[in-house]
């Protein structure tokens, strides 16, 4: 069974633990740097024009080398691979741990594209964590859950809220 584990800051540990608990051997760890977050990060230094400093990307060749967002994502993927019991690997790297993908763009599109050919998507609730119900999912997670081309395992990032009354069942 091929599983995709969608990693987000603050919830990734629960997703990796769920994958480990299922004993999955064919795992793809996915982290997405959202285009809006990247645009905000890259646009920030423009507000400092005329301050006499060069941006790191102004060197010849430019590129994303040294981007703190990329570095944080790579660190998250490495930590997740280690927690799963292996070193980061890839599809063509036999003997390595899980395949790791650091993607860029719209989060929902990138995650759904990464699910191509997968049998299972493991993701975590990332909305309101103090209550059960539809608000426990963000809009992006709700979209991914609704449109995933495979089965979805939705996990709580921490203990399930206790003592919360469930809404009445819908009338039929």
Name every feature range the model reports, one short phrase each.
Residues 10-11, 82-121, 159-172:
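Structural beta-alpha unit
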Residues 51-75, 130:
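A short acidic, glycine-rich active-site loop
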Residues 1-61, 147, 171-172:
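Small/aliphatic-rich secondary-structure junction motif
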Residues 143-157:
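Short, acidic/small-residue loops that bind anionic groups at enzyme active sites
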Residues 120-146, 161-165:
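Glycine-rich, Arg-bearing micro-motifs that act as flexible, cationic patches
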Residues 28-30, 99-103, 153-155:
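General small-molecule cofactor/ligand-binding pocket signal
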Residues 6-10, 124-126, 156-158:
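Structural motif
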Residues 14-19, 110-114, 140:
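A short acidic, amphipathic alpha-helical/loop segment
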């Amino acid at each position: 069974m091929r599983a995709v584990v969608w990693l987000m800051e603050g919830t990734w540990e629960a997703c990796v633990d769920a994958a480990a608990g299922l004993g999955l051997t064919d795992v793809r760890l996915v982290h997405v740097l959202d285009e809006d977050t990247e645009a905000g990060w890259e646009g920030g230094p423009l507000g400092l024009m005329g301050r006499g400093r060069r941006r790191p990307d102004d060197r010849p060749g430019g590129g994303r080398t040294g981007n703190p967002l990329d570095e944080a994502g790579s660190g998250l993927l490495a930590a997740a691979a280690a927690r799963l019991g292996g070193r980061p690997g890839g599809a063509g790297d036999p003997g390595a741990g899980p395949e790791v993908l650091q993607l860029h763009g719209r989060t929902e599109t990138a995650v759904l594209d990464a699910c191509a050919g997968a049998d299972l998507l493991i993701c975590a609730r990332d909305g309101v964590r103090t209550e059960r119900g539809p608000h426990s999912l963000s809009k992006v997670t709700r979209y991914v859950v609704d449109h995933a081309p495979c089965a979805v395992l939705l996990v709580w990032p921490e203990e399930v809220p206790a003592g919360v009354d469930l809404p009445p069942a819908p009338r039929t």
